[in-house]
Regions:
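N-terminal strand-loop-strand
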Residues: 1-41, 69
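Short loop/turn microsegments at loop-to-beta-strand junctions
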Residues: 8-9, 52, 127
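Short, charged/polar surface micro-motifs in flexible loops or helix N-caps
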Residues: 18-19, 31-32, 48, 78-81, ...
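The catalytic Nudix box helix
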Residues: 42-86
């Protein structure tokens, strides 16, 4: 039986505290995570059938972190058309990543975001949810990239300029 790639979303959630930039990361703990559980990751998840990609991103971030997204870079630039009962949007994410082999056949749309609210420390899909300094994340990415969920590495390298 023919199988198809699953569309997903991920969020690079930024914050600045005392003139220092942080992003939100968590430890992966998915029901179907297998060997990827225990890796550092961005909040992410699957897009439901006919779900608006920006609403999917908001839902996944809320479910996994407790935070509410207040801004998604590029959302205001989306193009929308509604003709004969069909609604279509076009958008530009920060980074698109496709897994070509391995455990997951995924196309991941990663967006830059801001969020607010009470941060959870653990959910049924993630643990150790926390803000990490950009410089600390750069060190992990350079020295131990195997600790980061593979589908998030390219977007993080782009974001961090490495």
């Amino acid at each position: 039986m023919e199988k198809f790639t699953v569309p997903c979303v991920a969020a690079i959630i930024e914050k600045i505290t005392n003139n220092e930039k942080y992003i939100l990361i968590q430890t992966r703990q998915k029901e179907d995570g297998a060997e990827t559980n225990g890796m550092l990751e961005l909040p992410d998840g699957k897009i439901r059938e006919y779900e608006n990609i920006f609403e999917a991103l908001r839902r996944e971030v809320k479910e996994e972190t407790g935070l509410s997204i207040t801004k998604i870079l590029g959302e205001d630039n989306q193009i929308s058309n509604f003709i004969k009962g069909n609604e279509v949007i076009s958008y530009t994410p920060y980074c698109i990543t496709q897994n070509l082999s391995g455990a997951y056949s995924i196309i991941l749309n990663t967006f830059l975001c801001e969020a607010e609210g009470e941060l959870l420390t653990e959910t049924n899909e993630s643990q150790n949810i926390h803000w990490i300094k950009i410089e600390e994340l750069k060190k992990i990415l350079k020295n131990n990239p195997e600790k980061i969920f593979l589908l998030h590495i390219n977007a993080l390298q782009k974001y961090l300029g490495i």
